[in-house]
């Protein structure tokens, strides 16, 4: 049987309005309360989503703040405080949490190879800086404390379920009673509705991803005496994802009417033998294809057939078939907080039968299909009240406690403690954390309680295991390891970064006549943004101006506005200096403008100290405004004359830009180019003198050799390859998955590098990441 998921789907809870959400950039960015209240109160929002902007000083998120978010994602606001630095709306609609850690990489790495990380930067709207890591980065972000080391764990609790368990049952609070009531129900009441099938990702007619799926053609009238069929499928992992290797169909009475091995169409990467029992030897002689079993299944099923499965959506997707009448026993036996009971547990607790025994090689699909059918029949025969009286939740929690080797603890007391870890939060709701890593980089987390650790030999193996295991766990941490920059290379990269951003923020303008109005020219070029320096170049036949701007947007605006205009009868050229660091600046600027974080952001110059108040007086003109970011001078604390406005959509930003650069406001502006956290980082870097003309930055010999030979382990190539691979993996995650990609940074005796975080929620309507 396919490995089971313990889903995290939860019932919706009422969302309270947030009073205020302050937002800062170098102590000066300001959020707009009215917009946040409007955003949170949108009644149509039915999916988990993140706020459009992060509320962080200098755009840096501490490891403790990351832990805040992860705990809130697991438990919600009723059990732990909301994160202080961002807003997660409709947390109860999250399906999974996945954290990718790129050990050895940093913020410097990301922006040194910005173009190579195209897949990731386009997919994630939120980016933030991380402080340099401690000796165990993962222990910090999941909140592991020293007192929680494995050696200090309590001893195993042995013995049966406490005798007072039944006495403490409150049937009215049991999720089965809340859904079905106390009276017995008929078969039709147990069928999943179309809305439920959509929620739990069943294949449905008309959905784009199901275009090539076949209909079972079962469209007869359904009654309480319609026939039930237990279905179970086994899958393997191929180059195209999961594919069917075995199907078993059991009719009422326990008779197996179909049991077929299936040869996948694509190359098999992993037989998943520990789950499926399928081996290369078993599958080699098989000639049956997917289309054969599809045809056979359509012929077997009567028009009013009801398929019964456990996580049946996975089976139907493996079959590439659509069936309208389904009962899913993982949803029929409702569990608290949207979790699901495992089939093995239900077989023992309800039917008293042992399945999926450890002494067997994998699961028996026919046995599982028969058990699934019997579970549905038991529910129909005895009704919800009988099931509720069994107190399955208490029994399952007791077994999980025994398996974890610990005594029961006071959950409320633990969750109220400020140092509660993510692992304890998961444990409190009966869930486990998946940790995938290389053997050499396991760290403290690998030996922690309530953590399922899989150690791999290489990054490639980590990636392959992640494809299989992530859907089976509500919370996953996947760690890849890369070679960190050497101290010499780090220093060189830092220098190049500073020089590059200085050069692409610099423009040369000319030629001008020797009698030009210098004061008017300076005033003209200063109208686009803050100027660091402005000098006359007299080495040329006619004078030119060299203007170094403080922000990239100002330089770009000057080029777009002035290149090719006539000044005193002479057509001037406005361009960036041409060096090996600026050769691809046009591509870089285009990519920055298309960065997902910049969508909906605009840059403005010429704003006054009362600009924010003026905006607030015209709320109808600037619908969708999320934040006004007003940078201040780092030395004197005065407000700068430029700002960034953050809107919910590109369309809202474009409308605002047209208004603000019009005749009434008379500001200069364009769409933003510099992501907010990058702007804060660049402003904090020590100044780097721009190179004299003609001076060339020569890369270290070993790096030059690596680029020439295009070795796969070169950091530039690694950034491109692994950015694409992780982007594809992200694209395969189920909708409603909160995903974080963390580049932890580095810390050594030679110096420290800040890290970088990327964050987003995988949405169902999201299109495939471009370029994959």
Curated annotation (Swiss-Prot):
EC assignment: the record states 3.1.-.-
Stretches with biased composition (Basic and acidic residues): 1-10
Domain (Exonuclease): residue spans on this chain? 228-376
The organism encoding this protein is Macaca fascicularis
Cellular component terms (Gene Ontology)? nucleus
Molecular function (GO) terms listed? exonuclease activity; RNA binding
Matching PANTHER family: RNA EXONUCLEASE 5 (PTHR12801:SF82), RNA EXONUCLEASE REXO1 / RECO3 FAMILY MEMBER-RELATED (PTHR12801)
Enzyme's top EC category: hydrolase
Which keywords describe this protein according to UniProt? Answer: Exonuclease, Hydrolase, Nuclease, Repeat, RNA-binding
InterPro entries from the UniProt entry: Exonuclease_RNaseT/DNA_pol3, Nucleotide-bd_a/b_plait_sf, RBD_domain_sf, REX1-like_exo, REXO1/3/4-like, RNaseH-like_sf, RNaseH_sf, RRM_dom
Query: Per UniProt, what is one Pfam family of this protein?
Result: RNase_T
RRM domain mapped to chain residues = 505-579, 600-679
Protein name according to UniProt? RNA exonuclease 5
Q: Please name the Gene3D superfamilies in this protein's record.
A: 3.30.70.330, Ribonuclease H-like superfamily/Ribonuclease H
Give the highest taxon in the source lineage: Eukaryota
């Amino acid at each position: 049987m396919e490995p089971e998921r313990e889903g995290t789907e939860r019932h919706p809870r009422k969302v309270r309005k947030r009073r205020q959400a302050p937002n800062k950039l170098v102590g000066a960015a300001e959020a707009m309360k009215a917009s946040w209240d409007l955003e949170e109160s949108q009644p149509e929002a039915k999916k988990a989503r993140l706020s459009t902007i992060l509320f962080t000083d200098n755009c840096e998120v501490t490891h403790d703040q990351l832990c805040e978010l992860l705990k809130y994602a697991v438990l919600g606001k009723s059990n732990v405080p909301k994160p202080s630095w961002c807003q997660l709306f409709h947390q109860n609609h999250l399906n999974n949490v996945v954290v990718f850690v790129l050990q050895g990489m940093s913020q410097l790495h990301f922006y040194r190879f910005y173009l190579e990380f195209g897949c990731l930067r386009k997919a994630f709207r939120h980016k933030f800086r991380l402080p340099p890591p401690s000796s165990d980065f993962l222990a910090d972000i999941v909140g592991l404390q020293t007192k929680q080391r494995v050696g200090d764990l309590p001893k195993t609790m042995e013995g049966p379920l406490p005798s007072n368990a039944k006495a403490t049952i409150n049937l009215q609070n049991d999720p089965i009673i809340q859904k079905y009531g106390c009276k017995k129900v008929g078969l039709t009441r147990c069928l999943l509705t179309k809305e439920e099938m959509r929620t739990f990702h069943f294949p449905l007619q008309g959905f784009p991803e199901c275009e090539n799926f076949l209909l079972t053609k079962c469209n007869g009238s359904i009654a309480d005496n319609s026939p039930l069929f237990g279905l179970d499928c086994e899958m393997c992992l191929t180059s195209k994802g999961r594919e069917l290797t075995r199907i078993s169909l059991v009719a009422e009475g326990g008779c197996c009417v179909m049991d077929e091995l299936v040869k996948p169409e694509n190359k098999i990467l992993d037989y998943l033998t520990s789950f499926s029992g399928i081996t290369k030897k078993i599958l080699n002689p098989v000639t049956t294809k997917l289309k054969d079993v599809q045809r056979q299944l359509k012929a077997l099923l009567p028009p009013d057939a009801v398929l019964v499965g456990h996580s049946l959506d996975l089976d139907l997707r493996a079959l590439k078939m659509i069936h309208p009448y389904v009962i899913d026993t993982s949803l029929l036996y409702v569990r608290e907080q949207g979790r699901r009971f495992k089939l093995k547990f239900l077989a023992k607790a309800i039917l008293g039968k042992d399945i999926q025994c450890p002494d067997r090689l994998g699961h028996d699909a026919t046995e599982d299909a028969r058990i699934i059918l019997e579970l549905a029949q038991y529910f129909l025969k005895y009704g919800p009240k009988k099931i509720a009286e069994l107190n399955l939740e208490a029994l399952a929690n007791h077994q999980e406690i025994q398996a974890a080797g610990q005594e029961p603890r006071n959950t409320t007391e633990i969750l109220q403690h400020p140092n509660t870890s993510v692992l304890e939060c998961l444990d409190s709701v009966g869930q486990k954390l998946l940790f995938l890593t290389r053997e050499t980089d396991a760290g403290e987390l690998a030996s922690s309680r309530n953590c399922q650790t899989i150690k791999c030999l290489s990054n490639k193996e980590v990636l392959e295991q992640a494809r299989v295991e992530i859907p089976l766990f509500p919370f996953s941490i996947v760690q890849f390891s890369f070679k960190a920059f050497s101290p010499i290379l780090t220093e060189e990269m830092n220098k190049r970064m500073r020089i590059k951003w200085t050069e692409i923020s610099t423009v040369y303008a000319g030629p001008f006549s020797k009698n030009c109005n210098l004061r008017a020219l300076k005033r003209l070029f200063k109208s686009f943004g803050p100027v660091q320096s402005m000098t006359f170049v007299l080495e040329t036949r006619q004078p030119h101006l060299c203007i170094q701007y403080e922000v990239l947007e100002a330089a770009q605006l000057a080029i777009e506005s002035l290149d090719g205009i006539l000044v005193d009868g002479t057509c001037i050229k406005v361009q960036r200096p041409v060096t090996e660091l600026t050769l691809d600046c046009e591509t870089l600027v285009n990519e920055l403008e298309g960065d997902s974080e910049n969508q909906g952001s605009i840059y403005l110059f010429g704003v006054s100290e009362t600009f924010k108040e003026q905006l607030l007086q015209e709320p109808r003109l600037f619908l969708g405004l999320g934040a006004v970011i007003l940078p201040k001078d780092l030395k004197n604390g005065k407000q700068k004359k430029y700002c960034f406005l953050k809107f919910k959509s590109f369309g809202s930003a474009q409308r605002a830009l047209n208004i603000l650069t019009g005749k009434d406001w008379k500001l200069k502006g364009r769409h933003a180019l510099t992501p907010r956290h990058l702007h804060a980082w660049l402003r904090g870097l020590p100044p780097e003198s721009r190179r004299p003309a003609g001076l060339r930055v020569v890369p270290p010999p070993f790096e030059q050799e690596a680029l020439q030979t295009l070795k796969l382990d070169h950091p530039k190539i690694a950034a491109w390859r692994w950015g694409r691979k992780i982007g594809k993996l992200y694209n395969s995650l189920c909708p409603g998955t909160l995903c974080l990609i963390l580049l932890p940074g580095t810390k050594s005796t030679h110096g420290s590098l800040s890290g970088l975080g990327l964050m987003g929620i995988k949405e169902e309507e999201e299109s495939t990441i471009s370029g994959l």
